């Protein structure tokens, strides 16, 4: 339905898909753990995600792209509240845990999680924690773009974010200009 709206088709020239995949692997991305909570039973869920970016400053909002086959995708369609936890360079083990190397039931045993006013767990030791309320969801191809209006945002001035590029973790550091 919305795929037609966006002109989605599978007519990409041969090889473009693989070349695009290789190209995107070389884009450094900030590593986040997105958390949400199922209704009623306080069943918490989280997943490592790198497809996150700001949308607008007025109103403050960001977008998250999630594969349609993930449980987090289904959860965000049902529950509007989620938190984007931007991990620090020291939180690789957390990223690994939430990327599927640890069962969903065990993931929150890593780290010192606290419950936000919206009922969702967040990580106070993260580089940043951005609480959002879903205001839109747009399917496209294998993924859905979720837009979240920011309800609170906190960032640490003493940590650096964890990055991921070419299937490995990277450190963020200021770049110097040569004279």
UniProtKB/Swiss-Prot annotation:
Domain of life, per lineage: Bacteria
Gene3D superfamilies in the cross-refs: Electron Transport, Fmn-binding Protein, Chain A (2.30.110.10)
UniProt catalytic activity: FADH2 + NAD(+) = FAD + NADH + 2 H(+)
Record's keyword terms, sorted: FAD, Flavoprotein, NAD, Oxidoreductase
GO molecular function: FMN binding; riboflavin reductase (NADPH) activity
EC number: 1.5.1.37
Flavoprotein in keyword set: yes
One Pfam family named in its UniProt record: Flavin_Reduct
InterPro entries named in the record: Flavin_Rdtase-like_dom, NADH-dep_flavin_reductase, Split_barrel_FMN-bd
Family: Belongs to the non-flavoprotein flavin reductase family.
Quaternary state and interactors: The FADH(2)-dependent resorcinol hydroxylase is composed of two subunits, GraA (the oxygenase component) and GraD (the reductase component). Both subunits are required for activity.
PANTHER family: FLAVIN REDUCTASE, FMN REDUCTASE (NADH) RUTF
Record function comment: Involved in the gamma-resorcylate (2,6-dihydroxybenzoate) catabolism. Reductase component of the resorcinol hydroxylase, which catalyzes the FADPH-dependent conversion of resorcinol to hydroxyquinol. Catalyzes the reduction of FAD by NADH. The reduced flavin is then transferred to the oxygenase component GraA.
Name of protein: FADH(2)-dependent resorcinol hydroxylase, reductase component
Species of the source: Rhizobium sp. (strain MTP-10005)
Gene: graD
């Amino acid at each position: 339905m919305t795929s037609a709206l966006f002109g989605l088709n599978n007519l990409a020239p041969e090889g473009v898909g693989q070349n695009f995949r290789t190209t995107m692997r070389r884009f450094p991305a900030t590593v986040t753990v997105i958390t949400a909570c199922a209704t009623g039973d306080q069943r918490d869920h989280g997943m490592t995600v790198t497809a996150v970016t700001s949308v607008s400053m007025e109103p403050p909002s960001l977008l998250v792209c999630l594969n349609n086959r993930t449980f987090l995708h289904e959860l965000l369609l049902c529950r509007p509240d989620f938190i984007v936890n931007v991990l620090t360079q020291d939180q690789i083990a957390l990223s690994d845990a939430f990327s599927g190397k640890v069962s969903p039931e065990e993931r929150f045993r890593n780290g010192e999680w606290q419950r936000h006013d919206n009922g969702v767990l967040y990580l106070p030791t993260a580089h940043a924690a951005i609480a959002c309320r879903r205001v839109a969801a747009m399917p496209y191809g294998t993924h859905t773009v979720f837009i979240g209006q920011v309800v609170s945002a906190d960032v640490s001035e003493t940590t650096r974010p964890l990055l991921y590029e070419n299937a490995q973790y990277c450190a963020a550091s200021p770049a110097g200009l040569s004279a």
